[in-house]
Amino acid sequence: MKRTIILMLDSFGIGAADDADKFGDVGSDTFGHIAQMCAEGKANNGREGELKLPNLSRLGLAHAAKEATGAFAPGFGDNVDIIGAYGHCQELSSGKDTPSGHWEMAGVPVLFEWGYFSEHQNSFPKELTDKILERAGLTEFLGNCHASGTTILEELGEEHMKTGKPIFYTSADSVFQIACHEESFGLENLYRLCEIAREELEPYNIGRVIARPFVGTGPSDFARTGNRRDYAVEPPSKTVLDKLKQAGGEVVSVGKISDIYAHCGITKKVKASGLEDLFDATLEQIKQAGDNTIVFTNFVDFDSHYGHRRDVSGYAKALEYFDARLPELMALLEEGDLLLLTADHGCDPTWQGTDHTREFVPVLAYGAGLEAGSLGKRGSFADIGQSIASYFGLAAMEYGESFMPAR
């Protein structure tokens, strides 16, 4: 039996990457700073005390972070029996965004520059928004700026509901985001608008259009829903997911994975939102998975709910919940299965601003004949994709070095 379970802890970086200076992120450390705030009693909203991640620690998380930063995170140390192989990965890709991290992890680094909307106000070219509005049968829109997704709802959500004008906004990432009320504007209308925007953005080389539906009656109860959709461009070449699919294997997407890969290389898509539902869905898909299958889950809440919102307590509580459920998942593993835990970038909740941070990401690997211990510093996220290709006996990827035992 050959099955790979990939758990993507979206935004869970473990220390500033070697090139963090190019991004203004020197000193960032998502894991380390969360652990520090917990140890100092500054992350006690809904939880309390030091950050407790015993199962991730046994897989090698704290040791991987020590190798990345030079020191154990506060509250973590050598007093643990390591059962997994662990390392830290440097990103080759030009950006610190979600598609770049995911694609590189699957063997296809993004070596070109994405397009960006760098102006914080009046962010979008008029000729672009005019075309989108005309095709959608609309006349005006709101936003046109860099913004936090929750803040912009507080500021413009009511006006959107009164006028029917969609909210267009962006960030430091290569994204064009559209927020609309599910009921007053309509979910299908939002999706159609995003499809139009995706087509019109082709010349601008923007990585993703994101549909951001929300509900509620006013700023006090506006809330984004689980009906988000990402409209990504296709990866520039075949990922390891494509290769397994072409070889007759199965690739199960749980959560937003399928959207991130523009549905390429995916054989089954399972919708789930929220940490609990995503974990439940992952367990169910592992139970159903046969030979030559990848079950791939993105746990987006770490990023969207806690990283971008700079919510240290929330991030810590979510990590502890995730950690507490890992034994359930590991109990489902069969002999020969490969479990991989990693991240796509950082999003340090103690950092200035609301954007991602350029960090090393962990690679925690368990099973499939791997010996417990250090995998060292990995030169690319693509080492993960190359290792998956090696595990399944697929043709080698162009990028990355496998850390799997010799066949």
Curated annotation (Swiss-Prot):
Domain of life of the native organism: Bacteria
GO BP terms: 2-deoxyribose 1-phosphate catabolic process; 5-phosphoribose 1-diphosphate biosynthetic process; metabolic compound salvage; nucleotide metabolic process
Database matches in InterPro entries: Alkaline_phosphatase_core_sf (IPR017850), DeoB (IPR010045), Metalloenzyme (IPR006124), Phosphopentomutase_DeoB_cap_sf (IPR024052)
GO molecular function: magnesium ion binding; manganese ion binding; phosphopentomutase activity
Location relative to the cell: Cytoplasm
Cofactors required: Mn(2+)
Residues the entry annotates as binding Mn(2+) 1: D10, D344, H345
Pathway noted in the entry: Carbohydrate degradation; 2-deoxy-D-ribose 1-phosphate degradation; D-glyceraldehyde 3-phosphate and acetaldehyde from 2-deoxy-alpha-D-ribose 1-phosphate: step 1/2
This protein's record includes keyword Manganese: yes
Entry similarity comment: Belongs to the phosphopentomutase family.
HAMAP family, per the entry: Phosphopentomut (MF_00740)
Protein known as: Phosphopentomutase
Record organism: Shewanella amazonensis (strain ATCC BAA-1098 / SB2B)
Gene: deoB
